[in-house]
Amino acid sequence: MKKLLLFFVVIFSTSCFAEWKMFVNRDGAVKLYYNAENIEEKDDIYLVYVRSYFAFEVPLNQEQKYRVTEAFIELDCIESTYSTLKTDFYSGYNLTGLFEKKVFENPEKKYLSRRNAYWRLAEIIC
């Protein structure tokens, strides 16, 4: 029994066991979740993992299409801004087919607006 438990711990990463909470559902076409267990906070600035699931393939370039992204974002509750620090692109819904990782050295700060999906996340976290 211990070997079986160890097998599952090794096979599945800790992110699989994290508490992912939905904060956007656009008629099933796009669903966004945030990792509620691993939020880091310092002086009203939050670091959060966000997963986006698309019901359709989204073109990244002419050759590659993705269905899931996992982004690590910085959410500033004082300035009402967010920055994407890194993004991983997957072709499969169960986070398989990782084909590109983007890490942003100097991430651009973008202001939150009601039209932006992260506005809802800011309402929850801030």
Where are these predicted regions, by residue range?
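Sec-dependent N-terminal signal peptides
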Residues: 4-13
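N-terminal secretory-pathway/extracellular module detecting exported/lumenal segments
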Residues: 16-126
